Design a protein with these regions (language model features):
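Extended oligomerization regions of viral-like shell subunits
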Residues: 43, 140-278, 284, 318-322
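Short intrinsically disordered coil segments
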Residues: 63-68, 103-108, 196-197, 294-305, ...
Length: 323
């Protein structure tokens, strides 16, 4: 029988091709920070902004000698309190030395992505909201009555654009929509909205990409994992009314001395010097607010610049803190 050097025989000396890149998606940034109004950087842990609180009025004078009435105007203070996001990523110096890629260069963009996710989740939905911050956008919209329930057989056109729809909620409070956020599942619902003749409203053809918008306001579908579809299907609002300021921009520091403790037990987990380790420490501090100034359509400041569409099965367990 003739012999042959088979692939199995030579497997130890066959080199597989290794692609010199890491297959991964591009890091996602904070959607809220890209749409809200950015104020000058904070110079301390608290920033005070003045907000119009009471509007003056005018009166008709009765006759030639009628008495003119008086009025007043008042202002209020709204505070932005800085909260801190931080993380420490420890790593062995030997691993750093042996790695084919720049590990710190790979980690830093993903930590920035995580910061954006945490910011969006806390501000919009109140998830892990810092105690220093005001209520989240969903809570404030619900307290203002700007939540729209979904029936068993929903008509999404009316829920979004009709009377008592999400856009009309903020319009009744005197605001115009500048943007909207929605869960990824809303794309299919929008593509399914049709005229009485069966023509899709949000899709002109099957080949071209669709630019989603609601009444002229661009509609975004966050992909950073912050949008909670169990709380809302869609959020619309005047994002220029929401403000934020940065106290400390993303700061990266490499530590090679000291110890790292478990946050719960306080036990020492790593001793950097003793174990030949380094740690990447990243810190970010910011504050935000929804000042809600008095307007002619909302003189009592009880309205809200945001509204949201509830999911088909709305969340029933939500923690609300009134301030």
């Amino acid at each position: 029988m003739a012999n042959i050097v088979s692939r199995t025989d030579a497997e130890a000396i066959i080199r597989e091709q290794v692609v010199s890149t890491i297959f991964q998606d591009a890091p996602k940034q904070s959607v809220f920070m890209s749409m809200a109004k950015k104020l000058p950087n904070m110079t301390s842990n608290q920033t005070r902004i003045r907000v119009l609180d009471f509007l003056p009025t005018a009166y008709w004078v009765n006759g030639d000698t009628g008495m003119k009435q008086t009025s007043r105007q008042a202002w209020d203070n709204v505070y932005l309190n800085a909260a801190e996001l931080a993380v420490i990523v420890p790593i062995s110096e030997a691993v750093l030395s042996d790695a084919e890629f720049d590990i710190f260069g790979e980690i830093t963009p993903r930590v920035n992505e995580a910061i954006g996710q945490r910011v969006d989740a806390a501000i919009i939905f109140g998830n892990n909201r810092p105690a220093e911050w005001p209520n989240d956008i969903i809570t404030m919209a619900r307290q203002a009555g700007n939540n729209v329930a979904v029936s068993g057989t929903p008509d999404y056109y009316n829920l979004l654009l009709g009377e008592n729809g999400v856009i009309s909620k903020i319009e009744d409070d005197g605001y115009m929509a500048t943007g909207a956020l929605a869960a990824m599942g809303m794309r299919a619902k929008l593509r399914g909205i049709r005229t009485t003749e069966g023509i899709p409203l949000f899709k002109s053809d099957m080949q071209g990409s669709t630019q989603y918008s609601l009444d002229g306001a661009p509609l975004h579908f966050p992909q950073n994992g912050a949008f909670d579809a169990n709380v809302a299907q869609l959020i619309v609002g005047d994002f220029s009314q929401a403000v934020y300021a940065i106290r400390q921009d993303v700061t990266v520091k490499i530590l090679d001395q000291g110890v790292i403790q478990d946050p719960v037990t306080k036990e020492i987990v790593y001793n950097l010097a003793q174990q030949d380790m380094v740690a990447l420490r990243i810190v970010f501090r910011m504050g935000w607010a929804l000042p809600n100034p008095a307007t002619r359509m909302d003189e009592d400041r009880v309205g809200c610049a945001f509204a949201y569409l509830e999911p088909t099965t709305p969340a029933t367990t939500q923690t609300v803190t009134s301030t």
